[in-house]
Amino acid sequence: MKLCISNHGLRPSGGIERYALTLVRGLHALAIRPTVIAKTFDANLPEYGWIDARRIRVTGLPSKWRDPYFDWRLRRIKAREDLGPLIACNQTGAADIAICGSTHPGFLAAMAQTPRRSDVWKIALEHEHLTRAQFVVAHSQRMADEAVRHHGITAEKIHLMYPPVDGDRFAPVDDDTRARLREALQLPNDKAVFLLASTGHRRKGLDLLARHFARTTLPVCLVVAGRPIDIAAPHIRYLGYRNDIENVFRAVDYTVLASLYEPFGLVGVESVLCGTPVVVAEGAGCAEVLRGNGRIVFALDDAASLDDAMASAVAAWQAGRHRIAEPAQALGYDPSVDVHVRGLIGLAQRVRQR
C-alpha cells in the first residue's frame, strides 16, 4: 500500500518523533515501505532502511520560519508527485490524516502563557493541519476535546486512537533481574523510589515535586531521567539521559506524572507495561486509560491531594503489594503497535476511496 508520513524528524527522540519511528516499525512488520518526509533523518537507524526518505532542508532559516517553510514545501511536493495518503505527525495543511498529539492553545492555557506573535503563527498552522485534513487522529480524549474547543473540528471527523507502545521492549522482568537493575542504578532498598522522566522540567512539574520531596517525612526518593536538573536535595537524584528507560521503569517503585500540560504521557503506559504503577495528575491524557492498581490519581492544584497520593503509594510499597502482576489489566486499551497501525491503514484506505 502506498503511504506517506511527515514529521520534523525521524530519529530517536521523545514525543512525536518516537511515535513516527513506531509507525515505521509497524508498517515494516506489515511489509509496507512508506515515504517519509522530514527535516532531518538519523541514517544510522535500521528504520531508515525501511523507508523512502525525502528531506526538506531548513538549514539557515530563522527558527520561526522553519515550520511554515516546511509546510509550504511539503504541500508542493505532495501535489507535484501525488504522494499520499499523508499521515502528518507535524502541523501541515497537506495532511490527509492529521495526528493531534497536542494543541498549542491548550499548552498556552495550561502554562499560563500569553500568546506572542510566534504563537499566533503556530496556532494558525495547527488550524490548517486539523481543518484541512480528512481525518483527525486524537491521541487522547483530552486532545479530541481541545481540537473541538480551540479549532472547531467536528466530533465526527475525530478518531480517538491512543498511541502505541512496543510491548517487546516494555515488559516486566522477574524479581532477580529487577533487583540487579536496582543495584546497577544504585537505588535504595529502604525507600520507595519514584521516577520523573522529563526533558522539559517546568511543564513536567519538577518544581511541584521538588517542593513535596523537600518537606515530606516519608521514606521516599525521586530520581529524574532526561534533561539535567539544577536542584540539589537529599531526596532527589539525577540519572542522566537514558537509552534504556525500560530498565529504569522496571527498577523503580513508581513513575510520577505531575505535568502542567500532558496531552497523553506515553511514559505512563510504558511504566505500567513494565509492572510499575503511576502516580498521575488527573488531567494527564494517559489517566484516561490507566486502571485499577496501575494508577494513583491526584489533583495538581491541591498539595494535600499529592500528599495523600504519595502516602497511599508508600503504604502499598511497605506492604509489598505495589507491583502490577498483570499489566494488560491495568490498561483500558490495547497498546500494541499492530492494532494502532492497522487503524491508521483503515483511515488511509478511506482517504483513497474519496
What are these regions (language model features)?
Residues 292-304, 311-318:
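Conserved acidic donor-binding segment of nucleotide-sugar-dependent glycosyltransferases
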Residues 260:
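Aromatic "clamp/platform" in nucleotide-sugar-dependent glycosyltransferases that forms part
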Residues 171-187, 321:
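A short helix/loop element that forms part of the nucleotide-sugar donor recognition site in Leloir-type
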Residues 142, 164:
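Carbohydrate-associated surface elements
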Residues 277-281:
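Short hydrophobic beta-strand element within catalytic cores of glycosyltransferases
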Residues 318-352:
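A charged, aromatic-enriched C-terminal amphipathic alpha-helix characteristic of glycosyltransferases
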Residues 137, 188-204, 210-213:
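Conserved donor-binding/catalytic core segment of Leloir-type glycosyltransferases
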Residues 241-242, 248-252:
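Short alpha-helical donor nucleotide-sugar binding micro-motif in glycosyltransferases
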